[in-house]
Each structure stands twice: as C-alpha cells, then as structure tokens.
C-alpha cells in the first residue's frame, strides 16, 4: 500500500537549454488533475504562440498510474518520452513538465532532440522544490454524546486531522489520517460501540 509519494511544491520550476540555436524553455508544475494539465498546456500554447513546439509529459496519482507524453509534432518519442523519463527517474507524481521549443534553423536529429528535451526537463526539475506528501484517507464515525471522552481520547492518541465535527443527540466526527493508519483508527472507534 502506497502511504506517501514525492511531488514538487506549487512554485513553478523553470529550465532552459540551447542546442544549435534552438531554444528549449521548460516549466515544471504541481498538478493533480488532467483538467489542470490541459489548462496549463493551453496557457503555454497561447503565451508562446510563435514557438514551433509545445511538448509535455505528466504523471498523476500516488500510484503513478495516470501519465501521458506528448511530442506535439516532433518525431515520435523524441520529446514527450524523454520528459516523462525524467519524471519517472526522479520518482515524482502529480507533476507536469512543459517544454517549449523555438527552432533555430538547424535540425537536431533524433538523438539531438532526445538529449535537448531531456536536458531541459532536468534543468526545470533542478529548479523545483521536492516535497513528500502523505496519502490520506477520510474516516467518519457516528457516536452518542456519552461516548465523547473515549472518542476524543483516541483522536488525541492517533492524532488525525479533524475535518469536520457535529455534536448533537448523535455526534459525527470526520477525520483525515494517513492511509496506513486508517484501519487501526476505524477498529479502535468501532470497539467503543461495543463497550
């Protein structure tokens, strides 16, 4: 079970690489959805409308199962895959790297393109702050008011984040806790119901 994952902070990491007068501008973003990816890529296409290519790669989710590499007109697997390769090598997720290419008039060839896009991605990652995030799970528990002290004792001991709580005839508490500890929290709370 994946309990934590590596990603980057919300600060955009910028990279730059030149090869035979072609300029490669790279930008690394923290993202969590495909819609965010589309919005950011569209923004770069609009901002750098005069650039020849806007290639990108992304990886999403703690399990790192959702990913895509886009060559945007470059020869197959010469742009998106090298960018994705750097994301994979760094074991990052919830990340998008966009590389903008301004053509310098000299063709780089397949290997030259692979190196250029890879190096631009490496430079963008070098200017990012890497962070480790926990995979959280929400646990909701309903209990009667007389059980309050016991519930709060468990909350204090296990230290989950209290997302929401309502205290009435029937009380409800909504907790966010590290995924690996969620089952233990559920078990301890359920035991209170039978005491």
Each model region followed by its residue ranges:
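C-terminal regulatory domains involved in ligand/effector binding and gene-expression control
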Residues: 1-77, 164
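Short cationic amphipathic helices and targeting signals
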Residues: 26-30, 137-143, 170-177
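A common structural junction motif
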Residues: 48-51, 158-163, 190-195
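Interdomain boundary/hinge elements
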Residues: 54-56, 130-139, 165-169
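Ordered, amphipathic secondary-structure segments that act as subunit-interaction surfaces
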Residues: 67, 74-108
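Glycine- and Gly-Pro-enriched alpha-helical subdomains that act as flexible
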Residues: 96-99, 106-150, 154-155
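Short amphipathic alpha-helices in soluble, non-transmembrane regions
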Residues: 151-157, 184-193
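Terminal, non-globular segments
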Residues: 175, 181-184
């Amino acid at each position: 079970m994946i309990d934590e994952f590596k990603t980057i902070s919300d600060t955009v990491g910028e990279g730059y690489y030149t090869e035979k007068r072609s300029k490669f501008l790279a930008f690394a973003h923290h993202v969590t959805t495909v819609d965010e990816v589309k919005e950011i890529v569209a923004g770069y296409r609009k901002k750098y409308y005069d650039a020849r290519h806007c290639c990108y790669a992304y990886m999403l989710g703690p399990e790192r199962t959702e990913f895509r590499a886009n060559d945007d007109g470059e020869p197959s697997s010469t742009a998106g895959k090298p960018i994705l390769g750097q994301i994979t090598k760094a074991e990052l997720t919830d990340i998008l790297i966009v590389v903008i290419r301004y053509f310098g008039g000299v063709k780089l060839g397949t290997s030259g393109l692979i190196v250029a896009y890879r190096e631009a991605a490496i430079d963008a990652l070098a200017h990012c702050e890497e962070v480790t995030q926990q995979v959280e799970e929400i646990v909701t528990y309903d209990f009667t008011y007389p059980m309050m002290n016991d519930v709060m004792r468990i909350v204090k001991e296990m230290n989950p984040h209290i997302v929401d709580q309502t205290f009435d005839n029937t009380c409800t508490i909504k907790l966010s806790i590290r995924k690996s500890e969620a089952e233990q929290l559920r078990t301890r709370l359920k035991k209170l119901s039978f005491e």
